[in-house]
C-alpha cells in the first residue's frame, strides 16, 4: 500500500473538504479530538478566516487525508498552538510526525520561539510522539482536561519576524 501523502497549504476554499474529512470518521475514532468532533464548523471557519494562522493538508492521490495547523497567531499570540488530524484510513503511516516536523520547521524559520499543543491524556501514542520530539508537559487544561505541552525551539537559526503593520 502506498502511504505517501504530499503536504500542501490549505486555503479558505478547502474548508468544505476539511468538514467532509471529519464527517467521514466514526465517533470512536474522533474520541481524542473533542474540538474536531464537537465543532468542526468552528475549525472550518478558522480556515476560512485565517490570516497569520497556518493550515496545511495531507493529500494522497489528490484527496485530503489529514490536516494540521498552527493557530493563535491571528489572535496575536506569540506561541501558536499545533493541531493535527489524520483520517483513520491514513493513520499509522507517520503523517502526524511529519506534520509536527513541518510545523516546527516553519515556526523556526519565522522566528517563533515556542509551540504549544493539547493532547488527551489517554492518547498514549500521541503523547509519546510529542515527548520524543521534545515537548514538556506543563499543565492540564481546566476546560478540557487535556494535557498542555510546550516545546522551546532552537534559537540559533531564528530570524526576526517583521513587526505587524
What do these predicted regions represent?
Residues 92-105, 109, 128-132:
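Conserved acetyl-CoA-binding loop-helix of GNAT-fold acetyltransferases
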Amino acid at each position: 500500500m502506498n502511504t505517501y501523502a504530499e503536504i500542501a497549504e490549505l486555503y479558505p476554499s478547502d474548508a468544505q473538504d476539511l468538514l467532509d474529512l471529519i464527517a467521514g470518521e466514526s465517533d470512536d475514532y474522533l474520541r481524542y479530538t473533542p474540538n474536531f468532533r464537537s465543532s468542526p464548523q468552528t475549525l472550518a471557519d478558522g480556515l476560512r478566516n485565517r490570516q497569520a494562522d497556518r493550515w496545511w493538508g495531507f493529500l494522497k492521490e489528490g484527496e485530503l487525508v489529514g490536516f494540521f495547523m498552527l493557530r493563535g497567531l491571528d489572535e496575536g499570540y506569540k506561541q501558536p498552538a499545533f493541531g493535527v488530524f489524520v483520517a483513520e484510513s491514513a493513520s499509522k503511516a507517520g503523517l502526524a510526525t511529519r506534520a509536527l516536523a513541518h510545523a516546527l520547521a516553519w515556526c523556526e524559520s519565522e522566528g517563533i520561539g515556542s509551540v504549544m499543543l493539547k493532547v488527551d491524556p489517554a492518547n498514549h501514542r500521541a503523547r509519546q510522539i510529542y515527548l520524543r520530539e521534545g515537548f514538556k508537559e506543563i499543565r492540564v487544561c481546566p476546560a478540557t482536561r487535556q494535557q498542555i505541552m510546550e516545546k522551546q525551539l532552537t534559537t540559533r537559526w531564528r530570524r526576526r519576524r517583521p513587526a505587524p503593520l
